[in-house]
Amino acid sequence: MTSIKLIMRPYILAETNWKAVKQAEFQVAVLPWGATEAHNYHLPYGTDNVLADRIAAEAAKIAFSRGGKVIVLPAIPFGVNTGQPDVKFDMNLNPGTQFMILKDLITVLDRQEIHKLVILNTHGGNDFKQMIRELNLLFPKMFICQCNWFKIPGGENYFEDMGEHAGEVETSFMQYLIPELVLPLSEAGEGKARIFRVAALNEGWAWAERRWTQVTKDTGIGNPALATAGKGEIFFKLITEKIGEFLFELSVVPPDEFYKEKS
């Protein structure tokens, strides 16, 4: 039986050790935050968590290789799923609970003078903006931001249907990253989604939470039919390069020099 030798990555907190950590300097902590929920019929419940772990690790690797003093914290595997109470095992953390988790973790970082935190979000139901505003008042020395990989532009160059949830993009990622957990696409639903009858709610300037099972029959929004591992690999490398560069820049910029004159 052949054993697989694992190599410790010094920028992943769960893999490193006190001997290494106590003498190292860190400028940026990365907190991956996913969700546990159904992803159409063909993707695992932990899709967002796989993406959180893999994207954070690869981006941190890129930043670390350039000299960025970055550390990735263990991912939070549960997110806001208040619109899906009738989907079995769609686990929910209320925003207030998320705030308390962040407050406790930031208390540790602030005490230890790691004053830059990136919440790397992989779940559309999570929105940390208002929490960050409140936390900024509580921790004036901290720089806290959220990073949503799905907001990074460029996917339209590789995917026919960008979708929202368990569609071509996420399926391609999972086919590339962990194909053994992806069912054949012949078993996937089409990811058809109903829209609001009220036009403003579809135009983005008015908002209401969607009742998920009234919108989609298979829990997906976006057709995964054209997904391929090749597309997933290309776009994964694109977004992790962008996030890696972001983490590096954030690591090296002095805390009192975040702003500059607009050219």
Task: Please report, for each region that a protein language model flagged, where it lies by residue.
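Extended, histidine- and acidic-residue-enriched regions that form the cofactor-binding/catalytic faces
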Residues: 2-117, 122-263
